[in-house]
């Protein structure tokens, strides 16, 4: 492998022996900046280790759904089917490349090892831990695109020094790991506690919509966490 993660093979040539690259570089330009924060990194490692815990028999993603009187019940958003074999990856091993030579690097990614491509019942999972900043415009645009192709995107907001908050948490009971979230993206639609949140207007530009989400959806969640 060379520095671009490409396979190189020797070419026998009596005059100028050399190596030939097979294929193109795996990744181009990264979209978005990484969180340079110990709390963020510790939380990513914590979630990753628990998801890969061999004692875990099942994984569930859930959310609190609130009634008008603020009582709530916990509802499951997604749980892999029994015939699934989910593998979990983080950071460099969770990269997703796009055709215009760019890529994003989710904190954690998961997929069913038995499927070549994600399906509605077997989606790919993206978990973004948010401590110091939320996804930038270009990154969010890619996450939105992916959510339309059987990817679930879960936003996990935390405060400094913590691995959970009032918005989300991880719990394990009887071999079942439950990751509770409040904010997530599925099927091109943002959700907050089970309810659709501010769908993009028919004539609204993506930039205007994202700016609104910056000042409401993401900022409010970071403040609450």
Which functions belong to the PLM regions below?
Residues 32, 138, 166-167:
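A short, polar/proline- and glycine-enriched secondary-structure boundary/capping micro-motif
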Residues 1-78, 82:
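Nuclease-adjacent, charged terminal/linker segments that flank catalytic cores
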Residues 119-163:
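Basic, amphipathic alpha-helical patches used to engage nucleic acids or provide basic targeting signals
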Residues 133, 151-225:
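Non-catalytic C-terminal interaction segments of nucleic acid-processing enzymes
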Residues 48, 52, 56, 148, ...:
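Generic surface-pattern signal
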């Amino acid at each position: 492998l060379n520095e671009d993660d490409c396979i190189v093979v020797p070419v026998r040539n009596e005059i100028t022996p050399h190596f030939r690259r097979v294929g193109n570089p795996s990744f181009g330009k990264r979209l978005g900046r990484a969180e340079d924060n110990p709390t963020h990194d510790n939380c990513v490692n914590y979630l990753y280790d628990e998801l890969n815990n061999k004692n875990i028999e099942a994984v569930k993603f859930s959310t609190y759904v609130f009634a008008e009187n603020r009582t709530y019940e916990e509802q499951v958003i997604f749980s892999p089917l029994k015939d699934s074999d989910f593998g979990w990856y983080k950071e460099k091993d969770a990269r997703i490349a796009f055709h215009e030579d760019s890529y994003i690097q989710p904190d954690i990614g998961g997929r069913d090892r038995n499927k070549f491509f994600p399906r509605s019942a077997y989606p790919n999972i993206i978990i973004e831990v948010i401590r110091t900043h939320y996804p930038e415009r270009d990154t969010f645009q890619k996450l939105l695109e992916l959510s339309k192709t059987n990817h679930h995107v879960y936003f996990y907001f935390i405060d400094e020094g913590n691995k959970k908050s009032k918005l989300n948490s991880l719990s394990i009971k009887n071999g079942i790991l439950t990751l509770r979230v409040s904010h997530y993206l599925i099927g091109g639609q943002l959700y907050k506690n089970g309810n659709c949140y501010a769908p993009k207007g028919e004539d609204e530009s993506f930039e205007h919509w994202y700016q609104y989400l910056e000042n409401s959806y993401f900022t409010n969640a970071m403040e609450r966490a």
